């Protein structure tokens, strides 16, 4: 239920693609293969960019398929992921400058924290991505004959 409240939420200024971008980027930092592959597939589909998931999983700071707004979002998500004890009021100004409101900032942090837990459960339980996840959103779907 909490997953759906975070990831399928219609309100706010985060797109479904941006939500998946947060999951993919922070899951890579947490070395969770399952979540990087599964959520990377959703990211490619939502953003309609076949390279974006690989770019943010390897190094979002050098990704060419994200906007400055998304980079600021990921900077904050990574700080929540790796150094949440260092977060202070100065971390919110860049997000506000890119049009995020306080609820969006809460969502960025909550998605990061929720999937930090999920990453650890997936890793210790040995979850592996389904093979079809690797191709989803990379190759155009074949059109069925009419």
Language model segments and positions:
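Hydrophobic alpha-helical segments
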Residues: 1-146
